[in-house]
From Swiss-Prot:
UniProt-listed Pfam families: FlbT
Keywords attached to this entry: Bacterial flagellum biogenesis, Repressor, RNA-binding
Superkingdom of the source species: Bacteria
Gene: flbT
Name assigned to this protein: Probable flagellum biosynthesis repressor protein FlbT
Similarity field: Belongs to the FlbT family.
GO biological process, one term: negative regulation of bacterial-type flagellum assembly
Function: Has a post-transcriptional repressor function in flagellum biogenesis. Associates with the 5'-UTR of fljK mRNA and promotes its degradation.
Single GO molecular function: mRNA 5'-UTR binding
Organism annotation: Rhodopseudomonas palustris (strain TIE-1)
Length: 126
């Protein structure tokens, strides 16, 4: 079953190695295949990955977009070790994220991390 994607005017999306920018009207299209897909709002850059959880998210994002877990594995393991030592309450989510990575479900790993980014922001704002 194809993935249905609706883009707002000028919204961008990454499909595989390509960035697609929508024109000035709302657009809907269907995507068949297994290329990595991320909406602009879900993409972090090196500049925006400025917290421990965001660095982990960026690492998993690169695994996903480049389809290369081993290239980022050591970096990921270092980041999660530091995070769990600093915030033990994040362990359960990090374990679930790691299980998704181990089973090759990188998009699910990213989805698992998104609420953790919000929790981290709440902790940092105190």
């Amino acid at each position: 079953m194809p993935l249905r994607v609706e883009l707002k005017p000028f919204e961008r999306i990454v499909i595989g190695q390509s960035v697609i920018t929508n024109s000035d009207t709302r657009t809907t299209f269907l995507i068949d295949g297994d290329a990595p897909i991320l909406r602009e709002k879900d993409i972090l850059t090196a500049e925006t990955a400025n917290t421990p959880v965001k660095r982990i998210y960026l690492c998993v994002q690169m695994m996903y977009l480049q389809n290369d877990i081993p290239a980022y594995q050591d970096l990921y393991l270092g980041f999660i070790k530091e995070l769990i030592e600093a915030v033990p309450s994040f362990r359960e989510t990090i374990e679930a994220t790691s299980n998704h990575i181990l089973s090759g479900n990188l998009y699910k790993a990213l989805r698992e991390l998104r609420p953790l980014i919000k929790r981290e922001e709440e902790l940092l704002s105190r």
